[in-house]
From Swiss-Prot:
Domain PPM-type phosphatase: from-to ranges: 1-176
One GO term describing the cellular component: virion component
Keywords tagged on the record: Virion
Key word Disulfide bond present: no
Organism: Acanthamoeba polyphaga mimivirus (APMV)
Gene3D superfamilies listed in its UniProt record: PPM-type phosphatase domain
Localization (cell): Virion
Intrachain S-S bonds: none
Coiled-coil region list: none
Protein's recorded name: PP2C-like domain-containing protein R307
Record InterPro entries: PP2C, PPM-type-like_dom_sf, PPM-type_phosphatase-like_dom
Amino acid sequence: MNESKRENIQVINIGDCRAVLCKNGLAIPLNKDHKPIWPDEKRRIDRVNEKYETNEKIHFDAGDWRIGDLSVSRSFGDLDNTPYVTHVPDLFDYQLQSDDEFIIMACDGVWDVLENHEAINFVRDHRNDNHTEFYSIPGKYPNREAFESDNISRKLASYAIARGSTDNVSVIIIFFSKE
């Protein structure tokens, strides 16, 4: 990345999908999960709850605070749990630096079984297997298809399942070119 031309990225999230940046080997979260137990979200829910006489939608179940049957405090389409669950996303800005290597974007099926640094280390350990990094750079190998075994996102998803994830698992990895 050209130091004189730094670029900004914006991460918009809702729910418990997470974007984690690898910066020179360190895991840097680029957003936060929307869980009812987190202080900011709890305050927002408490303010809403003051307007209503009952809070039977908010309860502790299966090791998580839940709103209705959801373990998140923000989501799209869950109108049954309005106004406690909001559809307003958070926006996070980040200025890319030359030591930024890649971003992992994944759903909670990954983050429930892997810590941020574990996922970052997994990708760093496997990024050179069959040149998987280059499949994410448009035009780098225009005449070669990425085989399933070469796909590092698939490898990370499979690793999360092997670690015991029982939730849905989806992963996107964006590598930054040093060119």
